[in-house]
Structure formats: C-alpha cells, structure tokens
From Swiss-Prot:
This is Large ribosomal subunit protein uL3. Belongs to the universal ribosomal protein uL3 family. One of the primary rRNA binding proteins, it binds directly near the 3'-end of the 23S rRNA, where it nucleates assembly of the 50S subunit. GO terms for biological process: translation. It comes from Picosynechococcus sp. (strain ATCC 27264 / PCC 7002 / PR-6). One of its GO terms (molecular function) is structural constituent of ribosome.
Amino acid sequence: MSLGILGTKLGMTQIFDNETGTAIPVTVVQAGPCTVTQIKTSETDGYTSVQIGYGDVKEKNLTKPQLGHLKKADAAPLRHLKEYRLDDVSGYELGQAITANIFEAGQVVDVSGNTIGRGFAGYQKRHNFKRGNMTHGSKNHRLPGSTGAGTTPGRVYPGKRMAGRYGGTKITVRKLEVVRVDEEKNLLLIKGAIPGKAGNLLSIAPSNIVGQK
C-alpha cells in the first residue's frame, strides 16, 4: 500500500479537454497539508506504517493523551489521524509535511468517505422497490408487499430489505483518475463523483493496480 493523504471535498465543477473540447466532470478536493505524526516499524509495532494528521483544531478540543501524542512529532493540534501501511518507511520522518504533490495528473486513486446521510427512508428510496398502482382501487402504494412465507419458516429472514436508515456509511470509490494537481493551493481535481457533501472528510490513496507496486 502507498501513502495517501487526507482532504476535504470542496464541490464539483467541470473542465474542458484542450484537444477535444470534451467537458470533464471533476470533484475539487483540498488535499492536505498533512503532518507525519507517527512512524511504526516492524521492530516496535510488528508492522510498518505512517500515521498522518489533518485539520487544525484548538488545543482545548483535544485530550491530554492526544496532545502528548502529537507533541512527540512537534505537530500542531490536529483533528483527524489516519494510518497508511507501507513496505518501507525510511523516507519519512516525524513532522514531515505531506502535500498534494505526492500525486500527479493521470494517476489512479481510491477515495474513501462517508456518504450523504438521508435519515430513515422507505422501500422505494432506499432499495428502489417498484410502488403499487396509485389508482384503480389499489390500496398498496408504497408498501413493501410480502416479507416472507407463512407458518414455515414463521419468521422474517435476517437481511430482508426493509425501511431503515439510508446513507451515512463509509464507502470507497476505486480507480478514479486525477485530472489535475494544483501544488500551490494543494488542490486535486478528480474525475467523477466522490462520497459526501462539500466539507466531507476524505482519504485519497493510490489504487492497487494488478502487476504494479
């Protein structure tokens, strides 16, 4: 696995291909800057990884253990911490800044984040069930219909698709293309849609391509 970066979704826009004039839908992401807050090695932790922090926060909003952990890296108070497992951590040091320049245009990345929470939703909205007739004497408009058999088994099987909370879950959208990198402003323009609303916390990491390291 390669080192990724934490960022914030800013919104969507479109850019145009200089050669063909085709409109490309892109999501603008504020990628970092992040700070290396911990380096784990096989000798001390049993595996190798790099932990990074993102998002300035007031000191009073963190606990003393959290502040003590960040102080070891001489890092400012940071809201979010995330760890990326690596094969080799020799090129990183505590307090090192991680910015958008670790990516390049044309690179393929995986983006993780929380989807938009829609609250308690019904069958049509949550599972795309077909509704019943609205006229001709029908009394079944947006009801689920049968949820199972009768006496046997005499219960509803676990996992039955029913109404409930919809969205607000963490997902990963894989193999999205980085269209453009703005190193001065630490912006990434990623082709396509990304989970969540504007302001959502994201983790962006290089995709694992079969046959490549």
